Amino acid sequence: DTGMIADVGTWFDIKDLYTDAVVDIKENSTILPGLIDMHVHIGFYDRRLDANAIRHNLGHKTLIAYKNMQDALSVGITTLRSVAEPEGLGSAIRAGLHKGYIKGPRYFTCERGIAITGGHGTRHDEKVQDTVIEADGEWEVRKAVRQNLKDGADWIKVLASHREHYCEYTLEELQAAVDEVHRFNKKCCIHAATRQAIESAVISGFDTIEHGAFL
């Protein structure tokens, strides 16, 4: 009745507990809980042939995000965490779900990612710098965290590496990000795909590491 899993066990363990429940299962089928995808970019559009036309149009990005939500739900994914989206998209999608305007998986947003100036995820054209906040130094990083929380972020995403073998953020900057996030009782994830970035992420206390090559 509550939409939650009531019990787990073999058929012989629980069959007498729910004698009035009717479940129609096709022959040779299996029931499993909803799947969880903790790393998506629900409004991602860069690899589309019409990316340049979409880049300046939040409406198009929103429609792409909605289609991706439906696709996820159709294959059994019932929870999504979106790790960096165009500004305003994540909180808008979440609000639409909560208000019943749209249907889709449970949804948690990081809003925009946080990156160094010119770092991973940034663009040369500032007019379309829509998926990250560029922040340098401990206090700029803290301010970027606060801005994302103001915009409605459930999680905070920091980007600390690209493809070179170093960490783009200093350890002090990463520690400032984690401290600020945890001070507000939120959790943070980090894009870390090099050894140095991963080591700094662990030392700093990030809650999850994204990609984690070489682990």
List where the protein language model places each region:
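Histidine-rich, glycine-flanked metal-binding segment
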Residues: 1-32
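Divalent metal-coordination and catalytic microenvironments
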Residues: 3, 28, 36-39, 76, ...
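Divalent metal-dependent hydrolysis catalytic cores, especially in the metallo-beta-lactamase
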Residues: 64-90, 104-113, 153-163, 187, ...
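Active-site mouth loops of central-metabolism enzymes
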Residues: 50-64, 123-143, 187
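Active-site core of metal-dependent hydrolases
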Residues: 159-215
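Metal-associated gating/positioning segment near the N- to mid-region
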Residues: 30-96, 203-204
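Short, acidic/polar
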Residues: 61-71, 134-149, 192-199
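Metal-cofactor-binding active-site regions of metalloenzymes
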Residues: 42-54, 85, 101-130
